[in-house]
A protein has these predicted regions:
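Short amphipathic alpha-helix that is part of the acyltransferase structural core
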Residues: 1-28, 99-103, 107-152
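Acyl-donor-binding surface of acyltransferase catalytic domains
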Residues: 53-130, 227, 249-251
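Conserved acetyl-CoA-binding loop-helix of GNAT-fold acetyltransferases
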Residues: 65-72, 191, 195, 201-218, ...
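Conserved acetyl-CoA-binding loop of GNAT-fold acetyltransferases
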Residues: 92-97, 236-246
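A conserved beta-strand-loop-helix scaffold within acyl/acetyltransferase catalytic domains
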Residues: 146-194
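Conserved hydrophobic beta-strand within the GNAT/NAT acetyltransferase core sheet
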Residues: 190, 223-227
Length: 254
């Protein structure tokens, strides 16, 4: 039976299902810890299952009966789920849509700094602690609801030392940003690397990513992130290690 992760027993099941999972072992327990009271309808657990349903895509650690899982996700209004095929069968009747490659860096290892347009790099201002609002606006310019949720969660995580975001400014314009949005359980889950469109292809994003990953690694964290298929070559070129793969499954068309 899948239930809300609100009781001590359900929370323990949730944490146990996430334990040792790359990426999900940082993001999901941290989200439950910080947001479980304010968003109790977002987190669910089964005997060997953890689910984070913060939107139309569910994030899943562990495993459950495929028929029960399909029915539950449909009831919750989910159209997709990300899971580890090595341990979980997909929801019954759902279709595999794409892979998410897990990249990372062994704690203590340092990557060489990638090439970049040095004149452009020198003209930008590095910001170790940019305001959350312009970061949210740069990442989600056309999705106001997602932007507001992101802003709120980032502020909550930062206030507790559980997130680290860097940025480069070109005057008063945010030129590039990347962050570690879940510092938990020895992992640093990196995400939301974004460069302003006119400046893309000049190396500043890759350099900022590597610098942040190197700093986190030197502090003993394992930097990890999920990568879409079209970005695999980019992160491979930067020197990150491929550590595994998750799969995205989508519900049948109605």
């Amino acid at each position: 039976m899948i239930r809300q992760a609100t009781t001590p027993r359900a929370k323990l099941r949730f944490y146990n299902a996430c334990r040792g999972k790359l990426c999900l072992g940082a993001t999901m327990p941290l989200a439950l810890e910080l947001l479980g009271k304010s968003q109790p309808g977002r987190f669910f657990a089964g005997p060997t299952l953890a689910l984070d349903i913060g939107g139309s895509t569910a994030w899943m650690a562990g495993h459950a009966n495929p028929e029960e899982l399909a029915g539950f996700l449909t009831f919750c209004g989910c159209s997709a789920v990300v899971l580890d095929e090595a341990e979980a069968a997909p929801p019954a009747g759902w279709t595999r849509a794409r892979s998410h490659t897990i990249f990372g860096l062994t704690p203590g290892r340092q990557l060489p700094e990638p090439e970049a347009d040095e004149a452009l790099w020198a003209s930008l201002t590095f910001d170790r602690d940019p305001p959350a609002r312009p970061v949210a606006e740069a990442l989600f310019p056309a999705r106001p609801a997602r932007r507001d949720d992101f802003y709120s969660e980032l502020c909550t995580k930062r206030s507790r030392g559980r997130a680290r975001v860097w940025a480069l400014w070109q005057g008063k314009t945010l030129a590039c940003t990347v962050g570690a949005y879940a510092l938990a359980n020895g992992q640093a889950y990196m995400a939301c690397g974004e460069t302003a469109e006119p400046l893309r292809g000049r190396g500043i994003g890759g350099r900022l990513i590597v610098r942040l990953a190197n700093e986190l690694s030197a502090e003993g964290f394992q930097p990890v992130f999920l990568c879409a298929p079209e970005r695999v070559h980019f992160y491979t070129r930067l020197g990150f290690e491929k550590l595994g793969e998750y799969a995205r499954y989508e519900a049948p068309a109605k």
